[in-house]
Amino acid sequence: ERANHLETLYIPFVDIEGEQSGAVEDDTEKPQITAYEVWKRGRAAGLVDTDTARAAFFTQNFADDYTLQLAPELYVKVDAASCRVKETEKIGVGGLTEQIVAVTVTGEGEILSGTVSASEKEQLLNTRMEDYLNAIAAHALEKEIDITNSYRNLGADNRTWYFKYQNTPAAYEKDIKIQYLVKINWKSE
C-alpha cells in the first residue's frame, strides 16, 4: 500500500448481470465491470463510471487502444496513442493565475461507424475528442479525482508546484484544471 500512496488507483467493481434471451429466461449470470472504485492516498474516494476510468487509463498511457463515441452515430478508435502531461500556468479570468494540467494526445485514429466530410474530418474529430475528454476530466475533478494522476510526478515535473502541494494533495486536485489538446492523424477510408 505504501508504494502506491501517491497513486490514484482504479479498482474494478464487478456486478453480476442476469441475461434474458427472447421469450425464455436464461438463468446464466455474467459478471460485468459496472464501475470503478477510486483509491487515492490509501483511502477509498468513491465510484466512477467506466468511461471515466477508461479515460484515466488512456491518459496515463495504460491503454493500447481507445474506442469512444463522439456523437450519437459516430464511433472512433485511437491506436498507438501517446499522452504527454505537462503542468503549466496561465492568466485566467480577472487576472488570476490558473494551474493547468495540459494533456497532449497524439496517435492514429479511424472512424468505426458514422460519417464526417473529408474536409472537416481532422479538425472536427480532434475537437470532439477534446470536448469529450475535457468534460470527463472536469466531472472527475468535481469529485476531486485527477484522471491524469499528475500529482505523483510533481517532484520531477514541476518543483514549484511540488513544494506548494507536497503536504496538501487534496488542495492540488481542487486548484488544477485539466485541458486536452488532441492531435490525432485520422485515417482515410
What are the functions of these language-model segments?
Residues E1-E189:
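Membrane-proximal alpha-helical signals and transmembrane carboxylates
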